[in-house]
From Swiss-Prot:
UniProt topology in membrane: Single-pass membrane protein
Subunit (UniProt): The 4 large subunits of the cytochrome b6-f complex are cytochrome b6, subunit IV (17 kDa polypeptide, PetD), cytochrome f and the Rieske protein, while the 4 small subunits are PetG, PetL, PetM and PetN. The complex functions as a dimer.
HAMAP family noted in UniProt: Cytb6_f_PetG (MF_00432)
Any one GO cellular component localisation term in the record: chloroplast thylakoid membrane
NCBIfam families xrefs: PRK00665.1 (NF001907)
A biological process term (GO) from this entry: cytochrome complex assembly
Protein's name in the database: Cytochrome b6-f complex subunit 5
The entry's keywords: Chloroplast, Electron transport, Membrane, Photosynthesis, Plastid, Thylakoid, Transmembrane, Transmembrane helix, Transport
Lineage of source species: Eukaryota, Sar, Stramenopiles, Ochrophyta, Bacillariophyta
Length: 37
């Protein structure tokens, strides 16, 4: 079994990475729309 602390760190890193990707994609999407309009 994986230690709770290790699993918590892994889950936290995955969540932060996913959030960062979503934010970056959203900002790029808005930036692209601003340039197109």
């Amino acid at each position: 079994m994986v230690e709770p602390l290790l699993s918590g760190i892994v889950l936290g890193m995955i969540t932060v990475s996913a959030l960062g990707l979503f934010v970056a994609a959203y900002l790029q999407y808005r930036r692209g729309n601003q340039f197109e309009i």
